[in-house]
Amino acid sequence: MDREAFEFEASVIIPVRNRIRTIRDAVNSALSQQTTFPFNVIVIDNHSTDGTTEALQEFSADNRLIHIIPQENDLGIGGCWNVGVHHEKCGKFAVQLDSDDLYKDEHTLQKIVDTFYQQNCAMVIGTYLMTDFQMNEIAPGVIDHKEWTVEDGPNNALRINGLGAPRAFYTPILRKIKFPNTSYGEDYAIGLSISREYTIGR
């Protein structure tokens, strides 16, 4: 990895639109991470109308939270990601958290960033558990995409519908490739693009 200077080692990126029921928990999960490095949380609020914007303003006292309302009105999830990644405060690693998700524990962000250095990769993909709103496990349970292998990951990726989560990216590479401005399959598309030239860590 190059020595490009970043103020923050990592940024948790949360695109959101109308998720008043879950956005507070998602942001709290991100802000509660315990790390050995500085990080922030960038929320791209895609013109919410259900109180999500006001809920995010409740975190205004925490300067680690950057709340962005894009000027554009035609952004999909991928477009929101591009806004966040190109923000001047985006960290060296851009780490996904969906607006209706939680990290497993307060050490998740540290584990993800450590993996970048251990495996010298451009993207890291983890494992997640499907639950209901009460955090009870629901089918299909754990999603780990074990069909991915170091030797044949890119080829296997063409045979599955998604690459897994949480996803994290080395920001300089992501800024060059960019997400497609869509709200379905944008993560799969960027993963396939990265896998053509770079290593994806698991």
Regions found by a protein language model. Give the residues of each.
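A conserved acidic beta->alpha catalytic loop
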Residues: 45-54, 73
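Short, acidic, metal-binding catalytic loop of nucleotide-sugar glycosyltransferases
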Residues: 28-38
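Conserved donor NDP-sugar-binding/catalytic core segment of glycosyltransferases
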Residues: 107-139
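Short beta-strand-to-loop acidic/aromatic patch adjacent to the donor-nucleotide binding site
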Residues: 91-102
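Glycine-rich, basic loop-to-helix element that forms the pyrophosphate-binding segment
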Residues: 71-89
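Conserved nucleotide-sugar donor-binding catalytic segment
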Residues: 150-202
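Conserved short acidic donor-positioning loop in nucleotide-sugar-dependent glycosyltransferases
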Residues: 30, 46-47, 75, 99-100
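Cell-envelope/extracellular polymer assembly enzymes that use nucleotide-activated donors
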Residues: 9-11, 40, 189
